[in-house]
Amino acid sequence: MTNLLMKEADIILATGGPGMVKAAYSSGKPALGVGAGNTPAIIDDSADILLAVNSIIHSKTFDNGMICASEQSVIVLDKVYAKVKKEFAARGCYFLDPAETEKVRKTIIINGALNAKIVGQKAARIAELSGVTVPADTKILIGEVESVDISEEFAHEKLSPVLAMYRAKDFGDALDKAEHLIADGGYGHTASLYIDVIGGKDKIDEYTHRMKTCRILVNTPSSCLLYTSDAADDK
């Protein structure tokens, strides 16, 4: 049915997996296709940390992270890393210890592919599947990892309330990490940045030139269709 509809359309906008995008490009009609998202969110040392953390939580917990535009990784500059971590924890996110991180690694990605059993599940359920005990009201599972290579399970699109968190020594390092994550599986999709827009104009310019994505967002949740002020004011 999908193939028949494509043949009748004047132009096709296809979002989904590789099969859907390939079908659109093979339809004989003009097509724009975007596959998987692997959205990195950079938190600069000039960012409003409360706004950044609450925006990411609102976005990542919407539909339990099923939206392909939702944040998959958070890259935090070293200067504010401890503050950001403290804020995530205070807002109900759970930081996995090294042993727990390894257990979740083996659950989120199996044989190189996303485990369908975690998609759209609550954080506590994913922890249970992994053999990890967390509070029932946990919002997001966060794994502190170093590698942005595709061999790192946390570097993949996860479509669930599971986040990778990276420490960047400076803004250039953060850009390098974000570029690599997008290359892992997010070309043409979404990238997000939290920064002081007045003092950080040069950084924003560099960011927009280096991120090979269609959606480049600044100081806003990446998956929510409507932004509300409680993202900043949530207590």
For each of these PLM feature ranges, what is it?
Residues 73-76, 159-169, 190-195:
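Short, well-ordered beta-strand elements within core beta-sheets of diverse protein domains
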Residues 1-9:
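A structured beta-alpha segment of the ubiquitous adenosine-cofactor-binding alpha/beta core
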Residues 8, 27-28, 211-212:
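Short, structured coil segments at secondary-structure junctions
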Residues 227-234:
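Conserved small/polar residues in nucleotide/adenosyl-binding loops
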Residues 96-102, 193-194, 216-224:
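Beta-strand->loop->alpha-helix junctions that form or flank phosphate-binding loops
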Residues 199-210:
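Short glycine/threonine-rich loop-to-helix capping motif typified by GTGT followed
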Residues 21-149:
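ALDH superfamily catalytic-core signature
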Residues 91-96, 182-186, 215:
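A common structural junction motif
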